[in-house]
């Protein structure tokens, strides 16, 4: 199977997000890469489901709280930018202050 670099990146994000979801489910606090992957994957899936950019910008702020991440992680992520595939094409979604 031949994958483009972009497809490989998407699979890597999905894999990291799956690991983060499992760890979160066990009550563990997420580290920086896990938190970014968790939010990014949710944004990409929302785009595939047909949600709007504005909806996803808000949705991204509801996924994790400071209680879900290790100390200092929320401050390390001022915003997350995700290039997501929507039904009408690829768009950049920016989530400001994703961890409240």
UniProtKB/Swiss-Prot annotation:
It comes from the Bacteria. GO terms for biological process: urea catabolic process. It is found in: Cytoplasm. Its EC number is 3.5.1.5. Keywords: Cytoplasm, Hydrolase. One of its GO terms (cellular component) is cytoplasm. Pathway: Nitrogen metabolism; urea degradation; CO(2) and NH(3) from urea (urease route): step 1/1. It is an enzyme of class 3 (hydrolase). GO terms for molecular function: nickel cation binding; urease activity. It catalyses: urea + 2 H2O + H(+) = hydrogencarbonate + 2 NH4(+). Gene3D superfamilies: Urease, gamma-like subunit. Heterotrimer of UreA (gamma), UreB (beta) and UreC (alpha) subunits. Three heterotrimers associate to form the active enzyme. Belongs to the urease gamma subunit family. This is Urease subunit gamma. It comes from Ralstonia pickettii (strain 12J).
